[in-house]
C-alpha cells in the first residue's frame, strides 16, 4: 500500500518537475532587457537584424549572449553591422547593466563623443569601441570599470587627414588607468591623441599581455620597465616620432612575442640580451635612432619570422648568425650604414619571402648560394656599392616577383639577357650611377615576361628600335628616364594597359605623336627635360582620355598652349616657349589641382573663367611670363589654393580682395610686377600663410596698421617687401606677434619642404620655389624648407629706429633692412638671434657702435653694415673677422685693430659705379663667398644638413643672368 502511495505521489510530481526543468533550460531573457535591445535597434535603424523581433527570446538573437543561469544579457556583439548615428548619453544601451562583453567596433557613430554613462555598466570585462568614428575626450568615468580585462579604443590614421576627428584624453587619464585597471590584459589606444608621457605606473599592470599605443603623439622618455612586464606578449609603440627611450636588459622570463618600435626617437644599441626573448616571432625596430652593430645573439631567436631593423644608424656587417633564423620570412635592414659582404648563411633562410638591403654600404657581389632561396618573392638592394654580376644569382630564383637594383655601381648588366628565367616577375627597377660604363640594353630581353607590370630603367642607354611585337602588353608602369633616347618610342603604342609613362630626362626631339593622347588607359605622362618642339598637327584633346597628370616642362615647345585632356588634375608646361594668351579652354578642366605654366612667353590678362577652377586648384604658378592686367577677383572660393605665384610678369592694379577666401594659402608671390596698392593687412586672416613676397612693385604706405591691430600672420616664415615705396616708422613692438619666427622649432624633427605631396604619377611632390636676396646675392631656391625664415624690407623709405622687438625672432635666419633711412643704434637684442646667418643693414643712417654682443652669433656667416655712420671697433667674433672689407666701408668712424685685421690700412670709400669687368668679378666673388661661408666654415652652419639641402638647389648661373650686374650695382648704390 505504501509503495502504491509513493508511486502515485511520484507521478503527480513529475509534471511539476518537468515544468521547473524546462523553465531552467529555456533561459528566457528578461523583458526589460529585451525592450532595451529593441529600443537600441530603433535608435540606429538596424535593418539587418532580422532575428531581433519581439516575439522571440532575445537570448537567441544574433550578437546576443545570455547567462546560462540568470538569463541576463551579458554579451553584445554588434561589430561591423553598419550602425550609423550619434551614440547618445540616454541610449537604451546603458540599461543593460549585466553586460560583461560589449563590442561596437567598425561602425559609424558620426564623430559623437563617448558617453560618460558607460560607467553604469559596472560588470564590463571587455569593451571594444574601435574604428567607430567616435571623437572628443574620452570620459574619465570609463576608468571606473575596474573589472575590465580588455579595452580597445583604437582608430586609424586616415593618412593624416586633418578633417578626421580623433579621440583624446586629458593628462590624468593614463595615471588613473594604471591605478584602477589592474586586471587589464589588453589595451589598444592606437591613434588616440594621448599627447603626453607614459607614466611609470604602467609597469605595475602585471596582468598586461598586449599594449598598442601606435600613433598616439607620445613624447618624453618611455619607461623601459614596461618592456619587462613578465606577461607582456605584444607591444606596439610605432608612429610616435617624439618618443624617446632605450631597450632594457631583457630577462629570461620575458613572454614577448611581438615588439614594434617604428618611427620613434628610440636610440642606443640593440642589447645582446635580445636573445632572451626566446618566444619572439616579430621584431620591428625601424625608422628610429638605434646604433651600433646588429648583435650576434640575435641569431638565437629561433621562432622569429619577421625582422625589421630598417632606417636606423646601425653599422658593421650582418652577423653570420642571421642564418640560424630558419623561420624568418621577412628581413628588412635598409636605410642603415651596414657594410661588408652579405653573409653566405643567408641561404639558410629558406622560408624568406622578402629581403630589403637598400641604402647601405654593402660591397662585393651577392653570394651565389642566395639562389637557394626558392620562396623569395621580393628583393630590394637599391643604393649600395655592389659590384660585379649581381643579377646572375637572382636569375636562378623563379619565384621572384619584384627586384629593385637602382643606384648601384654595377660594372655591367651581366646576365640580364637571361631575365626570361623569372616568369613571375612583376616589377623590375634598375638605375645606374654612370651609364657610360654600361653597354646599351636591348629591351627585347623583357618580351617574354608576361606578368611584368612595372618596368623602371634609368641612366642605362637603351635602343627603342626593333622592339618585338610581343613586348609585355600588360605593362602598367613604364619609366625609361635618362636612357639617352633620341626618338619617341613607337612600341609604346602597343601598351593596351599602360597607365603611367615616364620618358623624362632624355634627348627626344621632334613632335609628340598624336596616338599617345588616345591611349585608353593612360593616366600619367612625364615628358619633361627633353628637346620636344611640338605636337602632331591634328591632335586635339580626346574626350575619352583618362589622363590626370601631364608634365611637358623643360622642352622646346612653342606656339599656343596645348591641353591634351579634360580630366587633368596636374599639368606642367613650364620652362618652354609657349606663346599667346592662356586659352579659355583651360577653364573646362574642372578637376585641375596643380597648374604650372611658369617660364614661358604667355601674354594677355588672366581669363575670368579661371574662377571655375578655384574650388579644386591647390597650386597655381604663372611666374616669369609676360602676363598683364590686374589679378581678377576670382579667389573667393579658392579654399584649397595652397600656392599662388604670378611673380615676374607685368601685372598691375591692386591685389584682389577675394584673396581673403584662400583659407589654405601658404605661399603668395606677386613679386616683380607693377602692382600699385597698400600693404594687404586684410590677408592676416589667412592663418596658414608662410611665404609672402611683394618685392619690386609699387606698393606704398606703412608696414604697420595705423588702427593698432597686430601685424598678424602667425605662420609667416618668409616676408619680402623689398624695392617698393613703403615708408614710416616701425613701432618698437612691431615684431611682437611674429609667432612662427619666434617659436622654438623641435630640432629632433627632420626638416621638410613647403610642398604639395600629391603630384599624380610622381613620388616627388610639387615643391614651392622662390627667389630671395641672401648674403648679398639673389638666389633661387627650387625647394623651400619649412624651417627657412627670412625678412627683407630693403629698398624702401622706412626710417626711425630698428625695433628692439626684432630680438624676439629667435628662429630668423636672414634679415635684410638695407637701403632705407633707419637711424639710431643697432639694437643689441639682435644678439638673441642665435640662428641668424645673414644680416644686411647697409645703406642707412645708423649710428653708434656695433654691439659687441653680436660677436657671439656663431651662425652669422654674412654681414653688411656698410654706408652708415657707425663708430668704434667691430666685435671680436670670428664671423666679423671673416667678412670682406666692403662690409664695413662707408663708416669713417669705424676703427681699431679688429677692422685693420680685415681691411688693412683703412681708406674712406664711397659707393660708386665700377668698371663692368670689376663688377663681374666682384659679383662672382660675392656669390661664392657666401656659399663658402655657409658651408666651409663650421661655426656658421648651425643650419647643418638642412642648409645643405637649400644650397644644392641654388642655380648660380640662372640668378646671375637674371639678377646680374645691374642688380648688384643697384644694391651697392642705394
Swiss-Prot record:
GO terms for cellular component: plasma membrane. Belongs to the RLP family. It holds the Pfam family LRRNT_2. This is Receptor-like protein 7. Glycans are attached at residues 54, 90, 253, 279, 300, 348, 434, 466, 484, 529, 577, 603, 624, 637, 737, 816, 845, 864. Residues 899-923 are annotated as: Disordered. Residues 25-930 are extracellular. The chain crosses the membrane at residues 931-951.
Amino acid at each position: 500500500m505504501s509503495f502504491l502511495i509513493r508511486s502515485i505521489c511520484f507521478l503527480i510530481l513529475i509534471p511539476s518537475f518537468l515544468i521547473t526543468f524546462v523553465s531552467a533550460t529555456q533561459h528566457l531573457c528578461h523583458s526589460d532587457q529585451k525592450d532595451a535591445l529593441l529600443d537600441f535597434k530603433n535608435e540606429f535603424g538596424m535593418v539587418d537584424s532580422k532575428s531581433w523581433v519581439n516575439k522571440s527570446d532575445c537570448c537567441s538573437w544574433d550578437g546576443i549572449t545570455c547567462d546560462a543561469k540568470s538569463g541576463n544579457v551579458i554579451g553584445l556583439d554588434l561589430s561591423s553591422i553598419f550602425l550609423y548615428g550619434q551614440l547618445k548619453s540616454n541610449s537604451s544601451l546603458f540599461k543593460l547593466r549585466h553586460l560583461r562583453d560589449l563590442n561596437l567596433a567598425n561602425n559609424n557613430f558620426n564623430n559623437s563623443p563617448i558617453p560618460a554613462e558607460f560607467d553604469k555598466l559596472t560588470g564590463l570585462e571587455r569593451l571594444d569601441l574601435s574604428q567607430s568614428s567616435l571623437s572628443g575626450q574620452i570620459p574619465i568615468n570609463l576608468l571606473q570599470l575596474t573589472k575590465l580585462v580588455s579595452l580597445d579604443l583604437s582608430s586609424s590614421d586616415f593618412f593624416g587627414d586633418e578633417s578626421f576627428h580623433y579621440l583624446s584624453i586629458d593628462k590624468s587619464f593614463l595615471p588613473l588607468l594604471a591605478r584602477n585597471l589592474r586586471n587589464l590584459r589588453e589595451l589598444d589606444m592606437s591613434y588616440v591623441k594621448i599627447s603626453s608621457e607614459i607614466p611609470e605606473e604602467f609597469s605595475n599592470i602585471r596582468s598586461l599581455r598586449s599594449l598598442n599605443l601606435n600613433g598616439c603623439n607620445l613624447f618624453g622618455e618611455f619607461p623601459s620597465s614596461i618592456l619587462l612586464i613578465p606577461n607582456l606578449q605584444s607591444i606596439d609603440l610605432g608612429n610616435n616620432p617624439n618618443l624617446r627611450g632605450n631597450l632594457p636588459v631583457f630577462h629570461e622570463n620575458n613572454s614577448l612575442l611581438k615588439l614594434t618600435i617604428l618611427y620613434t626617437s628610440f636610440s642606443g644599441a640593440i642589447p645582446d640580451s635580445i636573445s632572451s626573448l626566446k618566444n619572439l616571432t616579430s621584431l620591428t625596430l625601424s625608422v628610429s635612432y638605434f646604433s651600433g652593430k646588429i648583435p650576434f645573439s640575435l641569431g638565437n631567436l629561433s621562432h622569429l619570422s619577421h625582422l625589421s631593423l630598417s632606417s636606423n644608424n646601425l653599422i658593421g656587417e650582418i652577423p653570420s648568425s642571421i642564418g640560424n633564423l630558419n623561420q624568418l620570412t621577412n628581413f628588412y635592414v635598409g636605410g642603415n650604414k651596414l657594410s661588408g659582404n652579405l653573409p653566405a648563411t643567408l641561404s639558410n633562410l629558406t622560408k624568406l619571402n622578402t629581403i630589403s638591403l637598400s641604402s647601405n654600404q654593402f660591397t662585393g657581389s651577392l653570394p651565389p648560394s642566395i639562389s637557394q632561396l626558392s620562396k623569395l618573392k621580393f628583393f630590394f638592394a637599391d643604393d649600395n656599392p655592389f659590384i660585379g654580376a649581381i643579377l646572375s644569382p637572382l636569375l636562378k630564383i623563379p619565384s621572384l616577383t619584384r627586384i629593385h637594383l637602382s643606384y648601384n655601381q654595377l660594372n655591367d648588366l651581366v646576365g640580364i639577357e637571361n631575365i626570361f628565367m623569372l616568369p613571375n616577375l612583376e616589377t623590375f627597377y634598375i638605375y645606374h650611377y654612370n651609364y657610360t660604363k654600361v653597354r646599351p640594353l636591348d629591351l627585347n630581353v623583357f618580351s617574354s615576361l608576361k606578368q611584368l607590370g612595372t618596368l623602371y630603367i634609368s641612366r642605362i642607354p637603351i635602343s627603342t628600335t626593333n622592339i618585338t611585337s610581343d613586348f609585355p602588353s600588360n605593362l602598367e608602369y613604364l619609366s625609361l628616364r635618362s636612357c639617352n633616347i633620341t626618338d619617341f618610342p613607337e612600341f609604346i603604342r602597343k601598351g593596351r594597359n599602360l597607365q603611367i609613362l615616364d620618358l623624362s630626362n632624355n634627348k627626344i626631339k621632334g613632335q609628340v605623336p598624336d596616338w599617345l593622347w588616345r591611349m585608353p588607359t593612360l593616366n600619367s605622362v612625364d615628358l619633361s627635360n627633353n628637346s620636344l618642339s611640338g605636337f602632331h598637327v591634328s591632335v586635339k584633346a580626346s574626350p575619352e582620355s583618362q589622363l590626370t597628370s601631364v608634365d611637358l616642362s623643360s622642352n622646346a615647345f612653342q606656339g599656343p598652349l596645348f591641353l591634351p585632356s579634360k580630366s587633368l588634375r596636374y599639368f606642367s608646361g613650364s620652362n618652354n616657349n609657349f606663346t599667346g594668351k592662356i586659352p579659355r579652354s583651360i577653364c573646362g578642366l574642372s578637376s585641375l589641382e596643380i597648374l604650372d605654366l611658369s617660364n614661358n612667353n604667355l601674354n594677355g590678362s588672366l581669363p575670368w573663367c579661371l574662377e571655375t577652377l578655384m574650388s579644386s586648384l591647390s597650386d597655381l604658378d604663372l611666374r616669369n611670363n609676360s602676363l598683364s592686367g590686374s589679378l581678377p577677383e576670382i579667389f573667393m572660393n579658392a579654399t584649397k589654393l595652397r600656392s599662388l605665384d604670378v611673380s615676374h610678369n607685368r601685372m598691375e592694379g591692386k591685389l584682389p580682395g577675394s584673396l581673403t577666401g584662400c583659407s589654405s594659402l601658404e605661399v603668395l608671390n606677386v613679386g616683380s610686377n607693377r602692382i600699385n596698392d597698400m600693404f594687404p593687412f586684410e590677408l592676416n586672416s589667412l592663418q596658414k600663410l608662410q611665404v609672402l613676397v611683394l618685392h619690386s612693385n609699387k606698393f606704398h604706405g606703412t608696414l604697420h596698421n595705423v588702427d593698432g591691430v597686430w601685424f598678424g600672420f602667425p605662420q609667416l616664415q618668409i616676408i619680402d617687401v623689398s624695392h617698393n615705396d613703403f615708408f614710416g616708422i616701425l613701432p618698437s613692438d612691431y615684431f611682437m606677434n611674429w609667432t612662427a619666427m619666434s617659436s622654438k622649432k623641435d630640432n629632433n624633427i627632420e626638416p621638410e619642404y613647403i610642398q604639395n605631396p600629391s603630384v599624380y604619377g610622381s613620388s616627388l611632390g610639387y615643391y614651392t620655389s622662390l627667389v630671395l636676396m641672401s648674403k648679398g646675392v639673389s638666389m633661387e631656391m627650387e625647394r623651400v624648407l619649412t624651417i627657412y625664415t627670412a625678412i627683407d624690407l630693403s629698398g624702401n623709405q622706412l626710417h626711425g629706429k630698428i625695433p628692439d622687438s626684432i630680438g624676439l625672432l629667435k628662429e630668423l635666419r636672414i634679415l635684410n633692412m638695407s637701403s632705407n633711412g633707419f637711424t639710431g643704434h643697432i639694437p643689441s637684442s639682435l644678439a638673441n638671434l642665435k640662428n641668424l646667418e645673414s644680416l644686411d643693414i647697409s645703406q642707412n643712417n645708423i649710428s653708434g657702435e656695433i654691439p659687441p654682443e653680436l660677436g657671439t652669433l656663431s651662425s652669422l656667416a654674412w654681414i653688411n653694415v656698410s654706408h652708415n655712420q657707425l663708430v668704434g671697433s667691430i666685435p671680436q667674433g670670428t664671423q666679423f673677422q671673416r667678412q670682406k672689407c666692403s662690409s664695413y666701408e662707408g663708416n669713417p668712424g669705424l676703427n681699431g685693430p679688429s677692422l685693420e685685421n680685415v681691411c688693412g690700412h683703412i681708406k674712406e670709400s664711397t659707393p660708386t659705379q665700377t668698371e663692368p669687368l670689376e663688377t663681374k668679378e666682384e659679383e662672382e666673388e660675392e656669390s661664392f663667398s657666401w656659399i663658402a661661408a655657409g658651408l666651409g666654415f663650421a661655426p656658421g652652419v648651425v643650419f647643418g644638413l638642412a642648409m645643405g639641402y637649400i644650397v644644392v638647389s641654388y642655380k648660380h648661373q640662372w640668378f646671375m643672368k637674371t639678377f646680374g650686374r645691374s642688380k648688384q650695382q643697384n644694391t651697392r648704390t642705394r
